C-alpha cells in the first residue's frame, strides 16, 4: 500500500538505493498502489558512480510491500520492506539484476521481473 511521499527501497542494480513516490499512476484520484502497479518516483539516494542521478524522476514498478496481499485461495503474503525496480521510458527494467524475492502477482504484468528475480513467492 504505497501512497505519495512513501519511501521505497530500489532492489535492482540501476544504481539507486532509495526512491520517494511522487505520483500513483492509473486514474485521476487514485491514492494507493500495491504490488504490480507503476508509480512515479524521485531518486533520493544513489551509489557512487552510477548512471542514475540523485533527484532524477523515473517510473517504477512495485515488487514488494509491507501491506499484506490477499491471494484468491485465501492466503496472505507480506514482505519486510517496500521495494521497487526502476523503469526506463519504454517501460522496461533499467537494471539487469533484481535483489530479494518478488511476489507471484507480478507474472500478470508481462515484464521480465519474474525471470530476473532470485525467488518468486
Swiss-Prot record:
The keyword Acyltransferase does not apply. Binds to 23S rRNA. Forms part of two intersubunit bridges in the 70S ribosome. The gene is rplN. Disulfide bonds: none annotated. Belongs to the universal ribosomal protein uL14 family. Pfam families: Ribosomal_L14 (PF00238). Keywords: Ribonucleoprotein, Ribosomal protein, RNA-binding, rRNA-binding. GO terms for biological process: translation. PANTHER family: 50S/60S RIBOSOMAL PROTEIN L14/L23, LARGE RIBOSOMAL SUBUNIT PROTEIN UL14M. PROSITE patterns: RIBOSOMAL_L14. Part of the 50S ribosomal subunit. Forms a cluster with proteins L3 and L19. In the 70S ribosome, L14 and L19 interact and together make contacts with the 16S rRNA in bridges B5 and B8. One of its GO terms (molecular function) is large ribosomal subunit rRNA binding. This is Large ribosomal subunit protein uL14. NCBIfam families: rplN_bact. GO terms for cellular component: cytosolic large ribosomal subunit. Signal peptide: none annotated.
